[in-house]
Every structure is written in structure tokens, then in C-alpha cells.
């Protein structure tokens, strides 16, 4: 019974206030998560359509791809687009993704000149800067429901750097949202664009009338395709961020409640002890008379 | 459903903007204006920043206008799909926002021209074109 009654009382009050704040933050995150989920759903239809048109266009072509965005170059330098959050209080969300990126980079590269990093979100940018890793592009302050316009800057930057042969392949590293409790770190190859992995999709037998010609359309469509894929991962990552925030805040609130319970028991015991002591003193005083 | 009807879907990253039957569509592609009728040959082509005119089978006199910011149009089995960065129906356009975008683009264009940055000029011109297109489409109300 080290602490005095008053000390325990203030502790209980302050923990209660903290739990109210974390409780409110949990609800805010929950609301944002719901919004982000519906946003991701709307985007899914777009991504599917772009993919379908691109496969329609590419599959009817028997010649090897000539477009620079589809040609596999010899890999001299790899770009990593790392998506993290801007603020903390999201549990293990950031450390998960950064850990997986670092271990992957260590496995694949021996030399620092073999890779470059594009950071989306302040936590990731600061993390790499603190470790003296070269970050070629930073985008901070993304809103909670990023619009296509907002992320266009970093997406276009990535696509342009690829086209300028700054790097020869691009991976996007982000947390994939599975459900509100689970997310998994993912590393996806975005560029060069390949359709090999979707071998189960039947090549359409319809021949298309192409105007003006295939190359021109591909030049317009492929950047749009790449942009939509990258934007898709950003939306996915944001959804995971809100889910992580919600879970972290729920855990914090639960912890606060258990701390308050313990403290209340401690407080009652201390009070009981002081009462007992008082009675003993009175009884002892009375019997001494 | 009668034979001479096609479906038009306009899809953007923000979701499906337009999903209706249509019996005639006019669009401006990179190669010039085209009219699309049901059962047309399968086509894929790029679109300009311009308006899309759609006449629907349920009302002969009514025409829907949609502002499209570029994108790709695919026509296949009487299903017309347009994927674009952004697109708005005339009734959904926020006129005051479009006005502001136009003024902003005009100012930026002057600055860019004064500084003679050709990339910047091109980009601002596209932005201005988009704003003008939105205003133009919204005037069809």
C-alpha cells in the first residue's frame, strides 16, 4: 500500500480521461474504416474494368510487347514505393511494413546503389532517412480518403521515373486489408506490367477495331493501368491503416479499463486499511483509559 | 430488352458515374467525333476531354450529357465501357467549383507563359480545358 489515497484517486481520474479519448479515437477510426471500405469497393470496379480492357487489347496481339512499360529490362536498380501512415497510434501497422521492406531489401541487394525508395507517408520517410537510405520522393499529409487527384503526383512520378529508366522494376509495399483485425504486409511488382500471372483468363477471340493504332492506345492506356493499380494499393493501405488504428485504440481502451479496475481495488483496499487502522487506534486509546 | 439497345457504363476511380441503356452515343475520340449505335463492331480507342451525348431508349427527346476527362472507350457486344480518370454528369457538376478551377487555371497559364515553361503551359492548358469542358457540359441543364 505504497500510494496514498489521493494519489490513487488522481491516477484513476487521469486513466479514465485517457480511456475516453482512446474510445473516441476508436470510434473515429471505425467510421473512417467504413468509408474507406466502401471507397475501396467503388474503386474495385474501376480497376477490374481497366484490367479487362487492357487484357482485351493485349491478348489480341500476338507479337511480343513493344511498349516500354511492358518490356522486361535487365534489372540494375529497383524502386520500392513504401506506403505508411503519417501519424502514429496505429499499433504495429508501420513497424510491420517497414520490417518486411528492410528484410526484403537486405535479402535482395548487397549494394545501396541497387535500389531507391519512394516514400508515401511521414513515418516511412523518417524511418529511411534516419537509416541513411536514399529516399527519392516523399509525399506527406495524404487525407484519410485520398482522391485520385491527390495521389496522382506520386503515381505519375513513379511511372515517369520508370519510363526514364531511373529504375528497372517497381515494387509497391503496403499493408493489405484483410478484415478489421487482420492485415498482411504485401510487396507487389507493378512495373514492368505483366499479364503472365493471369494465365487462367481466356484470351478473347474478338478482334478489335483499333483507332488510331495499338501503340497509341497502349501509350495512353498503360500509364492509366499502372496508375490505377498503384492507386488501388494506396486505397487498400489506407483501409488497413484505419483498421489498425481502430484495433490499437480498442486495445488501449480495454487496457485503460483493466488499469482502472486494478486501481479501484487498490483504492478500496487502502481505504479499508486506513479505516481499520483508525478503529484500532480508537479501541487502543479507549482501553488505555 | 429490344435488340437495338446497348449499355453504357462510365467508370472512374471514384466509382460508377453512369450506367444506363442507350440507343445512340456521340463521343469525341482522339481521331475525331464518332457516333455509336448498338451492335457496332468491337472497338477500342482513346477519348478526348470533351462531352459525351447519350440518348436513352426510354425518352426519345431527352439527352444526357457527361463530361469526360480523356480515358479509353471500349465497345464490345453492345456494351460500351468508358474508363476515365474522372467524369461527371451534367446534373452532378459543381458549377462554382468549375468556375474557380477555370479562373485558377487561367491565372496559372499566365504565370507559366510569363516564365516560358513549356511543360507547365501544357499541363495548365489541359486543366483549363477540363474546367471549360465541365462548364460547357453543365450549361446543358
Swiss-Prot record, chain A:
HAMAP family: ATP_synth_gamma_bact
UniProt xrefs under PANTHER family: ATP SYNTHASE GAMMA CHAIN (PTHR11693), ATP SYNTHASE SUBUNIT GAMMA, MITOCHONDRIAL (PTHR11693:SF22)
Main location, first listed in the record: membrane
Subcellular location: Cell membrane
Subunit structure: F-type ATPases have 2 components, CF(1) - the catalytic core - and CF(0) - the membrane proton channel. CF(1) has five subunits: alpha(3), beta(3), gamma(1), delta(1), epsilon(1). CF(0) has three main subunits: a, b and c.
Role: Produces ATP from ADP in the presence of a proton gradient across the membrane. The gamma chain is believed to be important in regulating ATPase activity and the flow of protons through the CF(0) complex.
PROSITE patterns according to UniProt: ATPASE_GAMMA
Family: Belongs to the ATPase gamma chain family.
Protein name: ATP synthase gamma chain
Keyword Membrane in annotation: yes
Any single GO CC term annotated in Swiss-Prot or TrEMBL for this entry: plasma membrane
NCBIfam families: ATPsyn_F1gamma, PRK05621.2-1
Organism listed in the record: Lactococcus lactis subsp. cremoris (strain MG1363)
Any one Pfam family match given in the protein's UniProt record, by short name: ATP-synt
Protein topology in the membrane: Peripheral membrane protein
GO biological process: proton motive force-driven plasma membrane ATP synthesis
Gene3D superfamilies, sorted: 3.40.1380.10, ATP synthase, gamma subunit, helix hairpin domain (1.10.287.80)
Gene Ontology MF: a single term: proton-transporting ATP synthase activity, rotational mechanism
UniProt keyword Membrane, yes or no: yes
Keywords: ATP synthesis, Cell membrane, CF(1), Hydrogen ion transport, Ion transport, Membrane, Transport
Annotated transmembrane regions: none
UniProtKB/Swiss-Prot annotation, chain B:
InterPro entries: ATP_synth_F1_dsu/esu, ATP_synth_F1_dsu/esu_N, ATP_synth_F1_esu_C, ATPsynth_dsu/esu_N
Membrane topology classification: Peripheral membrane protein
Alphabetical list of Pfam families matching this protein: ATP-synt_DE, ATP-synt_DE_N
Transmembrane spans: none
GO-annotated molecular function: ATP binding; proton-transporting ATP synthase activity, rotational mechanism
Record bears the keyword Transport: yes
Cellular localization per UniProt: Cell membrane
Keywords: ATP synthesis, Cell membrane, CF(1), Hydrogen ion transport, Ion transport, Membrane, Transport
Cellular compartments per GO CC: plasma membrane; proton-transporting ATP synthase complex
Principal subcellular localization: membrane
Family classification: Belongs to the ATPase epsilon chain family.
Assembly description: F-type ATPases have 2 components, CF(1) - the catalytic core - and CF(0) - the membrane proton channel. CF(1) has five subunits: alpha(3), beta(3), gamma(1), delta(1), epsilon(1). CF(0) has three main subunits: a, b and c.
Chain's role: Produces ATP from ADP in the presence of a proton gradient across the membrane.
Classification via NCBIfam families: ATP_synt_epsi, PRK00571.1-3
Protein name listed in UniProt: ATP synthase epsilon chain
Species of origin: Lactococcus lactis subsp. cremoris (strain MG1363)
